[in-house]
């Protein structure tokens, strides 16, 4: 399998040229990073080229890399990751494309893989990543009046409003939260020399 993925990596390097930024093979998985400029054409090649034949889009997800690696990440904040499957060659491929930090926009792949429709809407809803050319880019999981994108790492942990169904009005209403603002994070404080990982206890 590794030989086949190595051949695929070389083929993609030959065919995609400058569009292919990196191709990393690790633990039997090939991950490629593509540039935004050549991304739509690269997706068509991944689907239609007989040596690739990635006809099945398994998943699309957004990623927020802020504070990644305990704050050591210096690359772009947002990325979109596509997981592809070639039924013909029985191979998987992970494709990553980065977006701008201030206004994250990447090209939509709905025209290439129709299954991307709801996945891209989910990434928009949860991360605020825009997909240029998407036929119906609107929220899919949160309420239409929801403010913000809850999977962003800077999204507040404590809300200021709560919603409930009001039977008299026959709709969901928003009200200021009545709970005390606090963040409950489990903390374990041990005395020196206490705990199962102490040298005395081994």
From Swiss-Prot:
Belongs to the complex I 30 kDa subunit family. The keyword tRNA-binding does not apply. It is an enzyme of class 7 (translocase). NDH-1 is composed of 14 different subunits. Subunits NuoB, C, D, E, F, and G constitute the peripheral sector of the complex. The keyword Cell inner membrane applies. Keywords: Cell inner membrane, Cell membrane, Membrane, NAD, Quinone, Translocase, Transport, Ubiquinone. Coiled coil: none annotated. The gene is nuoC. HAMAP family: NDH1_NuoC. This is NADH-quinone oxidoreductase subunit C. Its main location: membrane. GO terms for molecular function: NADH dehydrogenase (ubiquinone) activity; NADH:ubiquinone reductase (non-electrogenic) activity; quinone binding. GO terms for cellular component: plasma membrane. It comes from Acidithiobacillus ferrooxidans (strain ATCC 23270 / DSM 14882 / CIP 104768 / NCIMB 8455) (Ferrobacillus ferrooxidans (strain ATCC 23270)). Its EC number is 7.1.1.-. Pfam families: Complex1_30kDa. It is found in: Cell inner membrane. It catalyses: a quinone + NADH + 5 H(+)(in) = a quinol + NAD(+) + 4 H(+)(out). It is a peripheral membrane protein. NDH-1 shuttles electrons from NADH, via FMN and iron-sulfur (Fe-S) centers, to quinones in the respiratory chain. The immediate electron acceptor for the enzyme in this species is believed to be ubiquinone. Couples the redox reaction to proton translocation (for every two electrons transferred, four hydrogen ions are translocated across the cytoplasmic membrane), and thus conserves the redox energy in a proton gradient.
